[in-house]
């Protein structure tokens, strides 16, 4: 029966809680029976900024809950996306690690990634000694992840031009069992891919109107293995560079439920990842045309990535003409990347121990206010959602260094003396910006008969103020060749979206959506500059960059039949002034990196996923099959060349069996060769172009078993056939000989994904 907004509105989390209680009750009864062949209704929050059934939203959203995170042994972003075509994450073999999400060929800082509504920092690149990525979240604090494909600027602003990844952290009600006031969740796990151990504990309690939660977790591991087995040095090395890694995470919450519908909560979160890295692949460098100049006799690094957040949130109901429900939150977050590099450096005129330090920090305050009002107008039911967000970001960065003579040679008169040639005064590659953003948004979900119409719009005003710090003026004279253009830059934009869904008969739903998006240039792209003549490259600013703009069209059809389902989506995205932050101008002596606007670009594609209950075809109850396929095609309309951010065709197919107490699945991943590559920016020593990844097929076997009540064992064997393969996102900036400009050359075998590996975890809910 059709459910309207007024008579069946759920306050946030009630839908998810209902599903959870149903699941717990089912597990308690008939534990040995086959699992019911019914797909429980999933919900989404990110698609409309309010909890809605997934089938009612006019966009494509993947929802991964806590149970699936455990069953799939998700230890990082790449594990999360293992069986999710159309979304990927690269960074294998790189010092800075996983570099964030790629959704339908749009990646990097164009994907809004948020934790409880607070955006995590952008990535930053400033040469081999300064690289920050966007992996600031540990999966253990997450109760669900939502992956929203396509532009969402009308709800989330500039950062969401390519999609939204929303992490929602654990709350006390996720740990406490029905009828209990004290609960705990203990977990331990191991992954052979990086020889990593996990220890995690979450405690929750409730007394009267108050509840609390405390989570502590730690990971200890090493480098993620490649398929290569040569443990030498330099470009000949095919094994991963050695690492010792430790990640710790703390989450604390306290809440006051002063009525059934009103809640005031405090949150503290701290993430810290520390890695010691022996960069054996850099020994003998720098490299050019495959030949090392033998200046780096050794190179080691220590990288620390941290994020700390404090927040207060208030949800309350009221009966007024303005709103039925209001929620507001105020958060402060500080995120840092500190990198230290120590190298035995032997150029032609000295022998020194050289140290390089880099620091990147984003500090932000975010105030978010959202209201909703349900009302009826003639034959239509409305859910009006509107609000505002005010955000201030302060971005700082610096680098410094020194050198100590190791022996008397050339300019080094005595061992232990300071090397003036290697002294680097505190400098910065960009003028530290303050970014102030003011947003207003409104959305109306209108239900009429079987139709739901969802118009929405958001107005964004952004002001970027660069600051001429001493560190920046040490790098460049503001009155010289690359001035900081006219100080403050401002942008404003109205982003509309219109979506529609039609429910045919409770089984089929069709939808369509038109959305506009935009993204403002970063301070680094506008003003950032860096020069490394010895390595043969420079990074130049482009103060004339225009904001990116997009228009997106999507249509799809969904079907639900008990334990079977399917979803198909077609999309077509147009981009204007698309910013290529890795644009390269090739030179005879050195290469120049400079952000450039691509005037016109298009991305189009199709995605399909489905699940079939094989019991309907005569198989034993509990058997099912599933499959998903994603295809995208991107084109730079200015040059006619492909967009290198597009992943090749990929599909994941599986056969599974589920009972209440145990289950398992065999998954088959297929990826086609990457045949559409723009090689115009590559200058390979052998005259070739970019490295094109070959196709591959992988088998994964996973299973879970409830040992006793509330204790579950999850295990998986991945790349079962031990295949050698490359993921396109890991190698797309490399040419056929393994050189990436002059920044991070690598033997391509060192960038391969792990061979056969396994992961296991044990979860105990008390």
Model-assigned labels for residue ranges:
Residues 239, 245-395, 565-567:
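Outer-membrane beta-barrel domain signature, strongest for Gram-negative TonB-dependent receptors
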Residues 381-505, 531:
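Signature of Gram-negative outer-membrane beta-barrel scaffolds
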Residues 30-31, 379, 385, 447-453, ...:
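Gram-negative outer-membrane beta-barrel transporters
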Residues 123, 518, 571-576, 672-678, ...:
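C-terminal beta-signal and adjacent terminal beta-strands/loops
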Residues 173, 181-185, 191, 198, ...:
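Periplasmic-side early beta-strands and strand-to-turn transitions of outer-membrane beta-barrels
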Residues 156, 172-182, 209, 261, ...:
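Short loop/turn motifs that connect adjacent beta-strands in outer-membrane beta-barrel proteins
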Residues 291-319, 429-435, 484-495, 499, ...:
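Outer-membrane beta-barrel signature, preferentially recognizing the C-terminal barrel domain
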Residues 32-179, 281, 555, 724:
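Acidic, small-polar-rich N-terminal luminal/periplasmic segments of exported/outer-membrane proteins
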């Amino acid at each position: 029966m059709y459910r309207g907004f007024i008579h069946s509105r759920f306050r946030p989390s009630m839908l998810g809680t209902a599903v959870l209680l149903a699941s717990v009750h089912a597990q308690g009864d008939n534990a040995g029976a086959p699992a019911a062949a019914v797909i429980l209704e999933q919900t989404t929050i990110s698609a409309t900024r309010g909890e809605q059934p997934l089938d009612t939203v006019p966009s494509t959203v993947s929802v991964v809950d806590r149970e699936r995170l455990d069953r799939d042994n998700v230890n990082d972003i790449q594990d999360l996306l293992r069986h999710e075509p159309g979304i990927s994450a690269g960074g294998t073999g790189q010092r800075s690690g996983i570099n964030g999400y790629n959704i339908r060929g749009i990646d990097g800082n164009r994907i809004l990634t948020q934790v409880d509504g607070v955006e995590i920092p952008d990535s930053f690149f400033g040469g081999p000694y300064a690289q920050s990525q966007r992996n600031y979240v540990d999966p253990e604090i997450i109760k669900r992840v939502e992956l929203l494909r396509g532009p969402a600027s009308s709800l989330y602003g500039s950062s969401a031009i390519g999609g939204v990844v929303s992490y929602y952290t654990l709350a006390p009600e996720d740990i406490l069992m029905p009828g209990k006031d004290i609960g705990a969740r203990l977990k331990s796990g191991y992954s052979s891919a990086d020889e990593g151990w996990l220890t995690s504990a979450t405690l929750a309690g409730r007394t009267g109107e108050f509840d609390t939660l405390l989570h502590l977790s730690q990971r200890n591991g090493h480098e993620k293995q490649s398929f290569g087995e040569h443990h030498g040095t330099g470009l000949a090395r095919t094994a991963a560079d050695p690492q010792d890694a430790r990640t710790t995470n703390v989450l604390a919450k306290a809440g006051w439920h002063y009525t059934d519908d009103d809640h005031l909560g405090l949150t503290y979160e701290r993430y810290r990842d520390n890695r010691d890295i022996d960069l054996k692949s850099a020994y003998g460098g720098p490299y050019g045309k495959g030949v090392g100049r033998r200046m780096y006799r050794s190179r080691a690094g220590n990288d620390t990535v941290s994020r700390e957040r404090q927040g207060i949130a208030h949800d309350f109901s009221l009966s007024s003409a303005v709103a039925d429900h209001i929620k507001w939150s105020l958060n402060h977050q500080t995120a840092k990347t500190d990198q230290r590099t120590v190298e035995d450096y032997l150029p032609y005129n000295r022998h020194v121990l050289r140290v390089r330090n880099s620091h990147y920090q984003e500090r932000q305050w975010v105030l978010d206010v959202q209201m909703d009002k349900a009302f009826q107008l003639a034959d239509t039911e409305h859910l009006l959602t509107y609000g505002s967000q005010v955000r201030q970001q302060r971005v700082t960065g610096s680098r410094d260094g020194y050198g100590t003579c190791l022996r008397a040679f050339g300019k080094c008169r005595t061992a232990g003396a300071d090397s003036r040639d290697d002294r680097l005064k505190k400098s910065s590659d960009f003028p530290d910006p303050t970014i102030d953003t003011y947003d207003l948004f409104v959305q109306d979900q209108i239900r009429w008969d079987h139709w739901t119409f969802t118009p929405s719009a958001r107005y964004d005003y952004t002001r970027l103020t660069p600051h001429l710090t001493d560190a920046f003026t040490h790098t460049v004279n503001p009155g010289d060749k690359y001035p900081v253009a006219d100080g403050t830059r401002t942008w404003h934009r109205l982003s509309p979206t219109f979506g529609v869904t039609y429910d045919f008969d409770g089984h089929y739903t069709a939808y369509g959506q038109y959305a506009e998006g935009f993204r403002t240039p970063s301070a680094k792209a506008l003003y950032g500059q860096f020069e490394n003549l010895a390595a043969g490259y420079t990074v130049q600013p482009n103060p004339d960059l225009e904001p990116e703009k997009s228009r997106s069209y999507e249509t799809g059809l969904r079907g639900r039949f008990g334990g079977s389902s399917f979803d198909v989506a077609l999309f077509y995205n147009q981009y204007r002034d698309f910013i290529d932050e890795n644009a390269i101008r090739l030179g005879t002596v050195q290469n120049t990196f400079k952000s450039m606007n691509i005037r016109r670009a298009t991305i189009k594609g199709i995605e399909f996923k489905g699940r079939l209950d094989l019991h309907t075809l005569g198989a034993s109850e509990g058997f099912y099959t599933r499959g998903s396929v994603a295809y995208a095609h991107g084109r730079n309309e200015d040059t006619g060349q492909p967009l290198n951010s597009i992943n090749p065709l990929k599909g994941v197919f599986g056969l599974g069996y589920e009972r209440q107490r145990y289950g398992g699945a065999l998954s088959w991943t297929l990826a086609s060769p990457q045949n559409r590559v723009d090689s115009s920016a590559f200058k390979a020593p052998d005259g070739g172009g970019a490295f094109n990844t070959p196709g591959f097929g992988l088998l994964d076997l996973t299973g879970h078993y409830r040992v006793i009540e509330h204790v579950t064992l999850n295990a998986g064997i991945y790349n079962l056939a031990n295949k050698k393969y490359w993921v396109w996102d890991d190698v797309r900036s490399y040419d056929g000989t393994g050189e990436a400009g002059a920044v991070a050359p690598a033997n391509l075998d060192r960038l391969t994904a792990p061979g056969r590996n396994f992961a296991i975890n044990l979860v105990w809910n008390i």
